[in-house]
Amino acid sequence: MPNKLLSANATVPQWDRHNLVPRIVHLGFGAFHRAHQAVYADVLAAEHSSDWGYIEVNLIGGEQQIADLKCQDFLYTVAEMSASAWSGRVVGVVRQALHAQVDGTEAVLEALCQPQVAIVSLTITEKGYCHAPATGELMRDHPLIVADLAQPHQPHSAPGIIVEALARRRAAGLAAFSVMSCDNIPENGRVIAGVVCAYARQCD
């Protein structure tokens, strides 16, 4: 990206992006993640030589976001504006981008099974957890869950994909990754733990 196309108020990566290791797979490449989590990782890379990079994944919807990211060498810009000023940051910590319905679920599972992946973070909205909000329990009659339980090695739901990836890692002798829900829902950690464990028990 020629710097002459950017405002002097824009911050661009001055560090070697090739040194990044994709240690985090993020499910749900939405605005909150783009403007906050990925920016924090970008600051760490710029100011503290962090090598933690992202693999961005959309499971359902957002096909154009992933397509655009691929066309832009996995770079995108976050703009901050006030009444008197504008600044931008070109975020450079993304190393790969996938869409489950475009690239295939198998490509997503392969990314999750890369040995260096340590964290799977999620901003998939409340609906993505396939749970009953009133109880926090997995909805076993949810269409995605029903389909995944019928074909557990070809999952489409977030719980199904996480469980299948963990099973493959265990079979390959790889350490499990940490699952980190970042959605704005009550007790998000308990919710993701509950639906993942409940789904895994159904698979057994």
UniProtKB/Swiss-Prot annotation:
Keywords: NAD, Oxidoreductase. NAD(+) binds at I24, V25, H26, L27, G28, F29, G30, A31, F32, H33, R34, A35. One of its GO terms (molecular function) is oxidoreductase activity, acting on the CH-OH group of donors, NAD or NADP as acceptor. It comes from the Bacteria. Pfam families: Mannitol_dh. Its EC number is 1.-.-.-. Transmembrane segments: none annotated. Belongs to the mannitol dehydrogenase family. PANTHER family: MANNITOL DEHYDROGENASE (PTHR43362:SF4), MANNITOL DEHYDROGENASE DSF1-RELATED (PTHR43362). This is Uncharacterized oxidoreductase in tutB 3'region. It comes from Enterobacter agglomerans.
